[in-house]
Amino acid sequence: MGQTLSEPVTAKESSYCQNSVFRVGSSCMQGWRINMEDSHTHILSLPDDPGTAFFAVYDGHGGATVAQYAGKHLHKFVLKRPEYNDDIERALQQGFLDIDYEMLHNESWGDQMAGSTAVVVLVKDSKLYCANAGDSRAIACVNGQLEILSMDHKPNNEGESKRIIEGGGWVEFNRVNGNLALSRALGDFVFKRANKKPEDQIVTAYPDVETRKIMEDWEFIVLACDGIWDVMSNAEVLEFCRTRIGMGMYPEEICEELMNHCLAPDCQMGGLGGDNMTVVLVCLLHDKPYSDLIARCRNSNKTAFEQEAGTATKTTQSNDNMAETQTSSPTTSPNSSLITPSEATNNSEEQKKLEKEAQDPLLAASEMQLNYIY
């Protein structure tokens, strides 16, 4: 774990956007770390491919430069690949390598030591493409069930370890050369000096890509950095988000609560809950109001909702097999708002604006172009 502050920075940068297809909320928090090194992107409609959405989380290390550069430019590298029109999977893979090459050979970067994970979800014509390099992660909720969209790249994974060793490196204490805790990343050019293809370097930017067909029973997608996944399992994050959607909370509020839930009470927990945190929650509307998704999650998850609204206590298991006890009563921030399905479309000026945007996706998309990088 990196250096920590004496008190966490809990101020959050949160935002939302919506059209007829998506209601997206995001939030990021510095937490216990000395610097904020994450970046994230949500674009409802790509300028060069209208109607195609692009969401991403970048978890930087050794500085924020690579994460910030990727947040501003990775989607552009993907879009300009000649394969994009016929083979988006290949365009994503080559786009990751292209932006990495651009940074490596740009003299203005000097001896850049920073790196970044990248987990990307691109949605085009009801087909989802998830590209991942590193240990940020994406999951989806399909009819209340977990759909895993990416796998973490860790040095101790058999395939990753084989590539590291063949590239001239080694794995020590589950780290690349005893240093880096992930085995694929943008940047980290000190590990990319072998006389090999980019995808065969000790640390490679080459992503795995998963594809899915989005159907009517797809409810939401979560992209987050390991500051979340080190503390909560995939299933726990899914239940956390789905229960709160059923309670009528907006996606950006759920992101804020999720980070609060993961934040360590002190910096003595072995790194768990002490990292920067970034979450993007993409709710799938299917050309219906957000209130329909609220009702769906509420009605099909009544048991979980009733437990969340009460004071029951349950024991959950973290990714690192550490048991923890949590109270199931809702913990809502002062700025959070609980809404019923009927209130969701009738009771606020903000919601009226959202409804207007839902009727005019281009309006929402054009407004988002002003501030889609965080």
Model regions: which residues?
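PP2C/PPM-type serine/threonine phosphatase catalytic domain
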Residues: M1-Y374
